[in-house]
């Protein structure tokens, strides 16, 4: 069985069994544990509709690729609970790039300061991500433009390998106009839907659905 690819294009587009912080999805989004300034973006990022489209359930094992400052991590950590696990694939703490090291350190500090994140695991983005066929879904939000080139191939290949058969790769990205060149995509931070899907299919994914839920008005 091929793994499943779901795209949301364009964009403004754990807790143990007695986890105190676990909620249903709407409760996780409404939780006071979220950073107040992050909640202001809900109207644009549509987290309930987005995660529902990807079919995310609270007992899944999920990898979030390149979570940055943890905008979606705040929601997922509140939602995913035993026997599920949330795994954050972040920059390497030993990266030669200072921004990557600082971003990883800030993320680690964020999750260490709140018991809600007690079962969140961290792995390196440039690693194999985990054991073969070990996770139910892999998600990434507005990151593809940072990976254009060989890095995208590596990440997509590792993502396919770590997903269980029939697992979901959920992608949200800024959508470039059809025909946009690679050079412009790299400079603009926007990626054509065609290119993203082609790379995914190259690594074994099957596209099953796209959504306009995060489309600009």
Where are these regions (language model features)?
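A short glycine-rich, Lys/Arg-flanked "PGG" loop and its adjoining helix->strand segment in the class I
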Residues: 77-78, 153-168
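Conserved class I S-adenosyl-L-methionine
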Residues: 58-68
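A short, conserved alpha-helix within the catalytic core of class I
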Residues: 124-125, 146-159
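Class I SAM-dependent methyltransferase Rossmann-like catalytic core
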Residues: 25-58
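S-adenosyl-L-methionine
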Residues: 99-129
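Conserved Class I S-adenosyl-L-methionine
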Residues: 182-210
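A short acidic, Gly/Pro-enriched loop at the edge of an enzyme's catalytic core
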Residues: 128-138
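Conserved beta-strand signature within the Rossmann-like core of class I S-adenosyl-L-methionine
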Residues: 87, 166-175
């Amino acid at each position: 069985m091929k793994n499943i690819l779901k795209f949301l294009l364009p964009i403004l587009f754990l807790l143990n069994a007695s986890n105190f912080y676990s909620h249903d999805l709407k409760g996780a989004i409404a939780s006071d544990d979220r950073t107040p300034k992050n909640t202001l973006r809900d109207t644009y990022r549509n987290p309930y509709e987005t995660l529902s489209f990807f079919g995310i359930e609270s007992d899944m094992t999920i990898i979030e690729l390149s979570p940055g400052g943890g905008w979606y991590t705040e929601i997922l950590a509140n939602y995913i609970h035993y026997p599920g696990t949330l795994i954050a694939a972040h920059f390497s703490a030993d990266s030669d790039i200072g921004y990557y090291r600082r971003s990883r350190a800030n993320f680690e500090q964020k999750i260490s300061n709140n018991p809600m994140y007690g079962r969140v695991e961290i792995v390196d983005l440039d690693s194999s991500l985990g054991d073969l066929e070990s996770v139910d879904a892999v998600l990434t939000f507005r990151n593809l433009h940072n990976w254009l080139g060989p890095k995208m191939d590596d990440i997509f290949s590792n993502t396919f390998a770590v997903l269980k058969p029939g697992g979901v790769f959920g992608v949200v990205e800024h959508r470039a106009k059809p025909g946009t060149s690679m050079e412009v995509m790299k400079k603009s931070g926007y990626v054509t839907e065609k290119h993203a899907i082609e790379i995914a299919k190259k690594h074994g994914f099957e596209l099953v659905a796209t959504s306009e839920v995060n489309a600009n008005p």
